[in-house]
Curated annotation (Swiss-Prot):
Cleaved signal peptide residues: none
Name of encoding gene: msrQ
GO cellular component, one term: plasma membrane
Organism: Azospira oryzae (strain ATCC BAA-33 / DSM 13638 / PS) (Dechlorosoma suillum)
Protein name: Protein-methionine-sulfoxide reductase heme-binding subunit MsrQ
Lineage of producing organism: Bacteria, Pseudomonadati, Pseudomonadota, Betaproteobacteria, Rhodocyclales
Compartments, record wording: Cell inner membrane
Quaternary state and interactors: Heterodimer of a catalytic subunit (MsrP) and a heme-binding subunit (MsrQ).
GO BP annotation list: protein repair
Length: 233
């Protein structure tokens, strides 16, 4: 049976989800305050914010498959919050590195980037997240158009790939299990995306094949569904 929440229920679900997204940040804030993050609290905080960036990014990517499997189309209305939460934790991850780890020392940061390329990969992932966060509104969809907006937001998969590479490169060989699990989950999500595209479009189009119209319809509908109907003035 398909569950379709009323507007009031959906508002309650969004409020509950928002509160849940705050829990990791509150946990680490309490850990800093109570000095319970271990021998190297700054490293624990930086890594924790990075892991939760990946967690919320992956939850964002899971929305479309879950909507398809369950028939709960209202899940799209939660995707923007999850995506912006991933960006917020990405900002905290970057901030803890620049401020608490490097103390805004530009020379030290430059040397760190040169010696530790995984930081460059992480920074690239963050830079790719910026336009996605800045274009997460109805105004952005109207300005860009549904097709271009959807094409831009496919960069979320590149962000996820770079995030996993960043994590794999960061950890030591004895601690590879967690990033490998993220890599496997990402492979499943990417595989689902490819299968879904083939199902909608047929085989990958060649130059002589005219572009299909149907995917554009889905793009517009999904973009609007993810943000909710704009209020009429």
């Amino acid at each position: 049976m398909t569950f379709q929440p009323t507007p009031r229920q959906l508002s309650a679900i969004k409020a509950a989800l928002f509160l849940l997204t705050l829990l990791p940040a509150l946990h680490y804030a309490h850990g800093l305050w109570s000095d319970s993050l271990g021998a190297n609290p700054i490293e624990a905080l930086t890594r924790g914010m990075g892991i939760w960036t990946l967690n919320f990014l992956f939850l964002t990517l899971c929305v479309s498959p879950l909507r398809k499997l369950s028939g709960w189309h209202w899940l799209l209305r939660l995707r923007r919050m999850l995506g912006l939460t991933a960006f917020a934790y990405g900002c905290l991850h970057l901030l803890t590195y620049l401020w608490l780890d490097q103390f805004w020392d530009v020379d030290a940061i430059a040397r760190d980037i040169w010696k530790r390329p995984f930081i460059t990969v992480g920074a690239t992932a963050f830079l790719l997240m910026l336009p996605l966060a800045l274009t997460s509104s109805h105004a952005a969809i109207r300005s860009l158009g549904g097709k271009r907006w959807q094409s831009l937001h496919r960069a979320v998969y590149a962000v996820a790939i770079l995030g996993v590479v960043h994590y794999l490169w960061l950890v030591k060989r004895v601690a590879l299990l967690d990033p490998i699990i993220y890599a496997l989950v990402l492979a499943i999500l990417l595989g689902w995306r490819v299968v879904e595209r083939i199902r909608l479009n047929g085989p990958w189009p060649t130059r002589s094949t005219p572009p299909a119209v149907q995917p554009v319809v889905f793009m517009k509908r999904d973009a609007v569904a993810a943000l909710g109907e704009p209020k009429k003035r």
